[in-house]
């Protein structure tokens, strides 16, 4: 499934047949030797809400929570009749509310745990202002004009900058 440019392999694991999600993610998400995806989403049983989401990055690391992945698993659960149009699921110990609207999914995210003051990062001769935001899943937020004065995304080497900033 695809969510805003991220692609995921989604598996119903309520039977708990998959015991090592990290190992499976490394194999199945490999774009050369596997199916290929940004991550693996396992839909598991929950005693609190409709289901629990376990998210693994393509390298097998535990991702905790991913908004795009959350929207994908919510649509998957609805399409497979695991959950209704409006439902709740668990991820990383938190409860998220999802609403299916035709082909779109609305997802209520957790309020940020912390937001840093503006910090600066030197990359070569460039000094970039950024903020760190922890929404239970860490994010770095940078104003696009730091890279391109007109704020245009065309020509921005996102993969290069993503690797540097990660």
Give, region by region, the residue ranges found by the protein language model.
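Active-site glycine-rich loop that binds ribose-phosphate moieties when present
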Residues: 111-130, 158-160
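Short, solvent-exposed secondary-structure boundary/capping segments
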Residues: 103-110
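A glycine-rich beta-to-alpha transition motif near the start of alpha/beta enzyme domains, typified by
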Residues: 1-102, 141-166
